[in-house]
């Protein structure tokens, strides 16, 4: 069987999903999970784009051991320099730069305003420049699927001659159909000189719902690497979903003689961790990881499954790490049991972070009798999301009733600074949001608000995921508590903290600017 490399770009392209931004700590934890999952390459970010992106790439590069860590760069010298600075401490065979430039007529005319020869010269110059610092260089011709094939062949030929070790073919706007994309890969495989000496990669977007199909067509026509994201998250309609591509190869190995290094039993835990970190919940009918995948409501289907599961299921829940055993720990469970349970889901924490998780676990175990798997995911992601210098909810009080005007008072703290405010609203949640706005002097617009139960039974925690629009940018927040008003306030503050940190409005030593 031919081995297909899995290039995961959840931390870079996936993070470009509106509201899916991750803190540095969250990126590191997600990268460790991706390493356990078995991906071959992790694209950690775009180092030149911001100090936070630079530091995230650097931290991921120092945290993981096995995968190749990749930094993105335009065909611009400062981009390549930044990628090198972020990755220079990593062994040469474990670091890669991914340089790109657009090649399609529409990009040449309207975005780059360059002629073909200028683009070829940039490829030659900057792939060669990157090669001075990196043994492994991937070159992408952005919008390749809408580029004239003869020019595309020339672009990839130029990149290989300049030292590229991987050429990547992006279907940047998800425009291609599987048969034509497969034919394009075949044409490149046959027509680009030197292509037999490099990896041939594809990066498919899902605008027409064909990202996975196009990636499969590419592999069937000679691609050796596929670029993916967990849960298919990414720009616009997203990217080729890791879990779908990998499980198609596993389930249909009778027709698809390809394999990957993915440990499929960690797919569901990885998906759940990403959901808790980003707040982006896969639709219930999402293939592989959706909540409905192994549920059967029709009487005929239920009868068939009870008699033999394979009548209506083509894979087992255990194939992707889903288990019906959800009850895990209680108030008498110790650190060893907690750490062991987390490790079964591929979650590895340093001692300081684990201690914070254990403290929150014991607090929760005192408040509810039974602690479930989803409770643990919530605790871990809550700890990872806590900005070191962000505002925290110290105290709140809500006064409400069906004959009263709901009011809320809050006390927020960052460093040694406290802010207090009270406001009325259309219900207790609206009142506490308005009180937070007043305390911080910010006027966000609530774009999305979702509440769901974590665990089962009357003691279940409420998990709130929301998205705020501030300065015309989206920031996601998440909060968990047995009190849904408190969970809502935590989520709201979490999103605002992301905004304040992104804009440099929180001092490093605590306190707001």
UniProtKB/Swiss-Prot annotation:
Keywords: Amino-acid biosynthesis, Branched-chain amino acid biosynthesis, Cytoplasm, Leucine biosynthesis, Manganese, Metal-binding, Transferase
Names of required cofactors: Mn(2+)
Region (Regulatory domain): 392-513
GO terms classed as biological process: L-leucine biosynthetic process
GO terms for MF: 2-isopropylmalate synthase activity; acetyl-CoA C-acetyltransferase activity; manganese ion binding
GO cellular component, one term: cytoplasm
Subcellular localization: Cytoplasm
Residue ranges of the TM segments: none
EC main group: transferase
Reactions listed under catalytic activity: 3-methyl-2-oxobutanoate + acetyl-CoA + H2O = (2S)-2-isopropylmalate + CoA + H(+)
EC code(s) of this entry: 2.3.3.13
Residues bound to Mn(2+): 13, 203, 205, 239
Sequence ranges assigned to domain Pyruvate carboxyltransferase in this UniProt record: 4-268
PANTHER family for the chain: 2-ISOPROPYLMALATE SYNTHASE 1, CHLOROPLASTIC-RELATED, HOMOCITRATE SYNTHASE-RELATED
Subunit-level organization: Homodimer.
Family to which this protein belongs: Belongs to the alpha-IPM synthase/homocitrate synthase family. LeuA type 1 subfamily.
Name of the protein in its database record: 2-isopropylmalate synthase
């Amino acid at each position: 069987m031919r081995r297909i490399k899995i290039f995961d770009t959840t931390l870079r392209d996936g993070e470009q999903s509106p509201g899916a931004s991750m803190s540095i700590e969250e990126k590191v934890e997600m990268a460790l999970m991706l390493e356990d999952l078995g991906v071959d390459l992790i694209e950690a970010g775009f180092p030149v784009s911001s100090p936070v992106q630079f530091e995230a790439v650097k931290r991921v590069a120092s945290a993981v051991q096995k995968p190749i860590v990749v930094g993105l760069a335009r065909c611009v010298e400062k981009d390549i320099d930044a990628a090198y600075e972020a990755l220079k401490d990593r062994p040469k065979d474990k670091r890669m730069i991914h340089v790109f430039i657009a090649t399609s007529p529409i990009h040449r005319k309207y975005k780059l305003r360059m002629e073909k020869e200028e683009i070829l010269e940039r490829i030659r110059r900057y792939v060669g420049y990157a090669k001075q610092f990196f043994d492994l260089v991937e070159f992408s011709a952005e919008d390749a699927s809408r580029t004239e094939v003869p020019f595309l062949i020339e672009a990839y030929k130029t990149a290989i001659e300049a030292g590229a070790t991987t050429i990547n073919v992006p279907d940047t706007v998800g425009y291609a159909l599987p048969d034509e994309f497969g034919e394009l890969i075949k044409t490149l495989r046959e027509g680009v000189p030197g292509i037999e000496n490099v990896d041939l990669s594809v990066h498919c977007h899902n605008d027409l719902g064909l990202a996975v199909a196009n990636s499969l067509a590419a592999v069937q026509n000679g691609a050796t690497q596929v670029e993916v994201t967990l849960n298919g998250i990414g720009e616009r309609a997203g990217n080729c979903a890791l879990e779908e591509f990998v499980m198609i190869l596993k389930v249909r190995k009778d027709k698809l003689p390809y394999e990957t290094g993915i440990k499929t039993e960690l797919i569901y835990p990885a998906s759940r961790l990403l959901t808790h970190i980003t707040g982006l919940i896969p639709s219930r009918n999402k293939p592989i990881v959706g909540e409905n995948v192994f549920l059967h409501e029709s009487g005929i289907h239920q009868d068939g499954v009870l008699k033999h599961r394979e009548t209506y299921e083509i894979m087992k829940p255990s194939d992707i790490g889903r288990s019906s055993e959800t009850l895990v720990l209680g108030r008498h469970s110790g650190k060893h049991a907690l750490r062991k349970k987390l490790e079964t889901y591929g979650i590895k924490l340093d001692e300081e972070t684990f201690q914070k998780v254990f403290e929150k676990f014991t607090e929760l175990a005192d408040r509810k009798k039974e602690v479930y798997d989803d409770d643990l995911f919530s605790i871990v992601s809550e700890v990872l999301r806590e900005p070191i210098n962000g505002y925290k909810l110290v105290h709140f009080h809500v006064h409400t009733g069906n004959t009263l005007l709901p009011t809320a008072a809050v006390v927020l703290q960052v460093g040694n600074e406290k802010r207090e405010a009270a406001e009325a609203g259309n219900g207790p949640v609206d009142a506490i949001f308005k009180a937070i706005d007043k305390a911080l002097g910010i006027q966000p617009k609530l774009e999305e608000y979702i509440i769901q139960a974590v665990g089962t039974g009357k003691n279940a925690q409420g998990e709130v995921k929301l998205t705020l629009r501030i300065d015309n940018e989206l920031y996601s927040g998440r909060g968990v508590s047995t009190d849904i008003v408190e969970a809502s306030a935590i989520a709201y503050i979490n999103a605002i903290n992301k905004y304040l940190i992104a804009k440099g409005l929180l001092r490093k030593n605590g306190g707001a600017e």
